Each structure stands twice: as C-alpha cells, then as structure tokens.
Design a protein with these regions (language model features):
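Hydrophobic/aromatic-enriched cytosolic interaction surfaces used to assemble or bind macromolecules
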Residues: 1-249
Length: 249
C-alpha cells in the first residue's frame, strides 16, 4: 500500500489499460465501483471478488482534514495538526497526502480495517483523502473570476473551497441540518472574505436531486454554476458525497 498523489500519478501512467476501482470509505460503510457504477458495502458483505483489478484507490471521508502549507509542514507534528481541530480517535490512524504541485499537505485520520483486509488478500491499493481528490480536480480548472467559490454538498455536511484566481485560499467543512443553516454558513464565509454574494458565482460540485432545495434557496441570492453534472442527477444508492460518483481521480 502507498499513499499520496505521486503514487497516484504513477498508477495512472502504468495502469491506463486496467480497470480502475474506487473505494469510498465512510464512518459506517463504503462504496465500491467506477465510472458512476457504485455499490454500497459493509465489511460483512465485502469479498475479494468485488475487486478483480490491481488498480484500487481508497478515498477516505471519515473526518475533515487539516490543510498545512508546505513551508510549515513537519511530519512529526501530524497528531498536533489534527488535535487542534478535534480529539483524536484511538481506533483511527493519522496519514497525510502531498499535492502534486507540492504547495500543501493534507493531514487526516483514517480507518485501517478495510486496508488490513486488502493487505491480507494481497490486493495492492493506494490510499488518499477526499479533499486531496477535490483539490487536484479543481486546481487545474480555468478560473475567470477574482474569487472562485466551490461547494461540495454531502449528506449531513458541506465543504467550501475558495480560490483567488488560481491560488488556493480556503477550505472548511460545516454541518448542515437544512437549507437555512447551509446558507447561514455560506454567507458567513463570504462575509469573512469580503465577497459580495450578489456578484459572486457559487460553483456547486455536481447537481443532484436530493439537494434541489439548497440550489433553489441559494439561487435567490447568487448566480449558480454546476461543475461536472450540468443536468440533475439522482443518487439512487444514497452515496454520502455524490459528486464522487463521477470517478474524478
């Protein structure tokens, strides 16, 4: 098993002809699939036959990561970075990813149970945090606005990512119970960056039927843009972060 984006780029070059399989690991379950064809699993229902490829990537969604600039990153301080945000879990391990542009490190907690099973079965895989995937997807995109706001809506949470032209500025994750709470946090962040919601475009990662009321509510205050899924998509398997059904790595 290896971690980090450098290994991801190597695997892309070496395994272009082999089928890529992604495992999206959440707190209580995980999804296995590729190219928008994913299935829900738990540890009891999982078998080696579900991974008939050598090109496997585990994407971890357990907890929001901590972003550390390259110049400030010290490997011995991994636990310290996370403990400033939340209490560390005894049953989770701490890992990190380095972005391909080497500007930031993504530090995060992850479950080891699935990785242990794959190692015992002799299945090679790479392991990466979900924000690393989003960062690597968004950073190369052409950004015409002075400030670009991206939102990844999830089941009970949402992520906000902000760029100043091509420079990454901000990432945070917020809980949400309803569209009003969602808009409150969004406006709070925009205010902190002195962004005018009436003139700032909000870029949603994907467009999914289950979040329609969030789109409609936000559209009352700002212009919306949908990244990747221009037409409304139904999340039939109740994926907790449906934008990742696009297999964007």
């Amino acid at each position: 098993m290896e971690t980090g984006l450098q290994f991801l780029m190597q695997k892309r070059n070496k395994n272009n002809s082999s089928k890529k399989i992604e495992i999206h690991q959440f707190k209580s379950n995980f999804f296995i699939g590729s190219e928008s064809d994913f299935k829900l699993f738990n540890l009891k229902s999982f078998s080696k036959d579900d991974l008939n490829t050598e090109n496997v990537t585990i994407i971890h969604f357990n907890k929001p990561p901590v972003i550390v600039p390259n110049k400030l990153f010290i490997k011995d301080n991994l636990n310290k970075y996370l403990s400033t945000n939340y209490e560390l879990s005894n049953n989770l391990s701490v890992s990190y990813d380095e972005t391909t542009n080497k500007l930031i490190y993504i530090v995060y907690e992850k479950k080891n149970n699935l990785e242990t099973i794959l190692n015992k079965k002799g299945i090679e895989f790479m392991s990466i945090n979900y924000f690393t995937v989003i960062y690597e997807y968004l950073t190369p995109l052409k950004k015409n606005d002075e400030m670009s706001i991206y939102i990844n809506i999830r089941n009970r949470l949402f992520d906000i990512i902000i760029y100043n032209k091509d420079e990454f500025l901000y990432f945070n994750t917020f809980n949400k119970k309803n569209k009003e709470e969602f808009l409150y946090y969004l406006l709070y962040v925009l205010k902190n960056f002195q962004a005018d919601v009436n003139s700032t475009k909000i870029n949603f990662l994907g467009k999914f039927e289950e979040f329609k009321e969030y789109y409609d509510y936000t559209s009352l205050y700002a212009e919306l843009v949908y990244i990747k899924n221009n037409t409304q998509t139904i999340n039939n398997i109740k994926h907790e972060s449906p934008f990742f059904l696009n297999s964007i790595i």
